[in-house]
């Protein structure tokens, strides 16, 4: 044994952001979340049927005439998803996942400006003035779920104060949930 090396250093890893400031209501016994090809994070919106509403975090400002936007990695975005801000939804026509380890470049025809830090949501269909989430939100996911792990029994939150800086859910989706508030 080398006597000069009596210790080792272990990288602490990535910090897990705090999403819930206060939880005051949960679905008794939890509920099933459907199998997902991407990781699911605490605070993501879930329908009554266990379908997750994807959330896309913008990592760089883009004007309303931009042909692409940069979305943080691990959002689950795929070609064909409809990305929405407010009531405007646009279809994703291509996704470049190879350019950066921090973000995906998503090809869209924007008609609304987006800012760094905005959380966009997965809409049911493209629209210039009537976009709505792909599923009606009922709960927030209360725990991490690994990709491709099958249907999972999880904690589902239906009453909480969540942190606006870290919650992976769009304001438009939160507005549809009467007992969830971003603070």
What are these regions (language model features)?
Residues 1-183:
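Surface-exposed, low-hydrophobicity beta-strand/loop segments enriched in small/polar/acidic residues
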